[in-house]
Swiss-Prot record:
Gene Ontology molecular function terms on file: catalase activity; heme binding; metal ion binding
The protein, known as: Catalase HPII
Disordered, as annotated region: 512-532
Stored CDD domains: catalase_clade_2, GATase1_catalase
Purpose of the protein: Decomposes hydrogen peroxide into water and oxygen; serves to protect cells from the toxic effects of hydrogen peroxide.
EC number: 1.11.1.6
Keyword Cell membrane: no
Organism name: Mycobacterium avium
A cellular component term, taken from the record's GO annotations: cytosol
Amino acid sequence: MATDHTSDAPDPKQRDLESARFRRDTGYLTTQQGVRVDHTDDALTVGERGPTLLEDFHAREKITHFDHERIPERVVHARGAGAYGYFEPYDDRLAQYTAAKFLTSPGTRTPVFVRFSTVAGSRGSADTVRDVRGFATKFYTEQGNYDLVGNNFPVFFIQDGIKFPVLVHAVKPEPHNEIPQAQSAHDTLWDFVSLQPETLHAIMWLMSDRALPRSYRMMQGFGVHTFRLVNARGRGTFVKFHWKPRLGVHSLIWDECQKIAGKDPDYNRRDLWEAIESGQYPEWELGVQLVAEDDEFSFDFDLLDATKIIPEEQVPVLPVGKMVLNRNPDNFFAETEQVAFHTANVVPGIDFTNDPLLQFRNFSYLDTQLIRLGGPNFAQLPVNRPVAQVRTNQHDGYAQHAIPQGRSSYFKNSIGGGCPALADEDVFRHYTQRVDGQTIGKRAEAFQNHYGQARMFFKSMSPVEAEHIVAAFAFELGKVEMPEIRSAVVAQLARVDDQLAAQVAAKLGLPEPPEEQVDESAPVSPALSQVTDGGDTIASRRIAVLAADGVDVVGTQRFTELMEQRGAVVEVLAPVAGGTLAGGSGGELRVDRSFTTMASVLYDAVVVACGPRSVSTLSDDGYAVHFVTEAYKHLKPIGAYGAGVDLLRKAGIDNRLAEDTDVLNDQAVVTTKAAADELPERFAEEFAAALAQHRCWQRRTDAVPA
């Protein structure tokens, strides 16, 4: 259950939510009308075996409410997880660009609610599918609610919102049999891609490791569109929004994703929840790319094109503030499911551009809430309520919670003293611009280069990231049944990069496509690679320590302490869950879980504890041996000390392993024969350094059977 935060000093939004909260673990059971009941297990009948009576209003209320508990799920982004927190600007450097106070008031913490999500799958689908991730943030500002409704990709698959229904129809389960669920690896999506080259840049992101985040806490977020900041004088500046995680950008491996989907389909939402509950609050830095209006046409692409990025090397990202998530919701449905984001929820100082995808989102998000949340009053739901004062002339409608007072509900009026009145300060004013032209159903020529940035993305990858992209295309297209679709996609890839197309074709058994005329001098953007960025922290990383009776208690406790000092989470896994293990030299070690019910894919690293009897038991257990082998195959740091080194040999790890008490680190396999109170701190240091790099990309494990 969620941590009890009632004693915390609440922010304005938490104070607002208090009026809607009630505790189920106190008081007496009542009906919806507040009538106490003394029996709820049997309906009212005539005698013990007679007919049930309709006059049992309590039973009818229970069943009727149950029958109506479900609401329509979101058409996209149905599966999600959310959390509360705050945003705080570093300084007032944006004051010259925007009138938005929450961006320009250092020391002011603006409450936020963030919802992360997958896109294609239904509400009950797995977290670790290959997909875009939603990253939507609701800022409860003093000037009203502002929603930054972004993704973990900076680009989208289409340029014009009129194509959104067909894109979603293509990626969703095919209509004749409702298969596959939460997957892009099927004919209709790739048929769409082969015929719509504007999708290719986003498809490159989808085939990359960016589509497989290790954690919501370890992925970037982007506003996708070019927005406009407007200052107090009405002057505009184009802006792109970026969220950068403090923990770095890290991903799972595709084989891990598929296994986690079965082992723990709630993997990402559980990770977010547990991190917040344990006080390891996720944090992101908000950055902006600013482009003066005079420079609108100085790029080789159109700023209004949502399938393009502004390379950070051309326009650096300016850090302007931080966001911290520090509270889990009290009720998933009431908060995470009923939260309603809308790209048109803006505040003074932030405005739109003529991005044709953004314009349709501004219509669609409001429209969809009307059916999903049962009418026009969804903004009154507790999670959606602004902390700013709300006074409108809109009234009535389903689920009206407010009780407006007074006779007038229109403007202008004299009966109500002219109120609610129009303000002349701190108001939203639409950006003033001249617009003229002929009515035409056509996109600008600057929108037509669909291959250049897709090529830039691929060329900016590290070798291992490029390998993963090739493998992803081969996997996805290998699931496509119609060979002509596979060939058509490969032909499109040839216009992105001939080597990419050739490698994918080879893996599919297709002839190498003819070489296309491509610009080999295409620029690269190092900022696009997440591997070259590395890492410098192991905070919240999960380490599994394998042990059994006879374990070296002193050495294990020492290692655990050294890792926890660095912020890692260490769990002892044994053949049986719970209880304690008897130490080989006395003492006991608490067991957290059993490795028979867990898996290496749920951890970032594995360590085998010392203790001859413990290691002997583990060596005879196929689960334990596979646990180590699988983690090794997935390039994770592996550690062993004392007799634990012997289990690595049993697991088939052929790296150089320690033969004495010196610490040896060979491709993130860290070993020493030292143990107990002689376990050197350098062992922990080397292991932590390897873990901070996330994986050892130099390790070749294709032949490892796991």
